[in-house]
Amino acid sequence: MPSSAFLPRALALTAAALLAATAAASPAHASAPPPGEADTPLAPGAAYKAAYDTLGAQRLTPAQRRLDAAKQARAADTSATARGAGAALAGYKLSGALHQSQKTSYWCGPATLVITQSAHDGVAGRSQQDAATLLKTNTSGTAWYGVDINVPGPTGYPMADALNHRLPGAGYVPRALPYTPTATDKANFKQHITHNTDHDYAIAGNAWEVPGGPHLVGHPNIEIFHWVSIDGYNTDTAAAQVDYLDPVGGVSTSVISWAGSVPKSAHISSDTLTTIMGGRGYVW
């Protein structure tokens, strides 16, 4: 399902249009939870997501599985090192991503691509049109999975493929999340944002906000599919809070009616953000 702000189910850019645009989704939906986590209480909004998500299982390629395992091992080491250095790194540590406001109501994906890319190479002002073309973004948004873009060896994950194409050697890999992320999912995300930030990379997060569930800062209590760039973490709390850049920030209310309440940059609990991304995931 594509995921771009703002796309509430009841408006012209409907979830039905989104569902028609791609045909696959998260493997985490059907996977067994880690031992001891089978009884994790349903996250707020999880039942809604389960009821309305018609996407099937997604697949990581063998190369992506190997890369994810290798990065996970490195991330665990990075997180442990960061905890040891916490006193010296008081406050938020950022990767330095450069914000852009999305140019249309459905270009949060292209904006997130150029923002996330800028965290590593420091280049501002890249074309969102070029990013939209690369991602195969349409009026339904930018897909989480199920779209092969025009790069060598596409995997079906357009954001991951675009980032790896534009940042050779970056090793971006998608991490899918279940509707109710487990304690392990939340701990892994803390390790991943620590690892990426410490290595000068941001994370592209694919949010699925639903009525009754948690929302990003300034977002209304409606269903919204959205991409954001997660560019740092709180060293004082071992990444219990993170910093993210929201492409809706700075957008005219004539384009997105509720944009006026959305900051360009915001802090949020990492557990809350992990829950918001449940049913989709992030590219780290």
Language-model segment annotations:
Residues 1-32:
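Secretory targeting and sorting signals
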Residues 73-98:
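N-terminal low-complexity, Pro/Thr/Ser-rich intrinsically disordered segments
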Residues 31-54, 65-81, 137-284:
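Conserved active-site-adjacent core of cysteine acyl-enzyme catalytic domains
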Residues 10, 84, 127-130, 195-196:
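Positively charged, low-complexity intrinsically disordered regions
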Residues 91-141:
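Active-site nucleophile-adjacent alpha helix/oxyanion-hole segment immediately C-terminal to the catalytic cysteine
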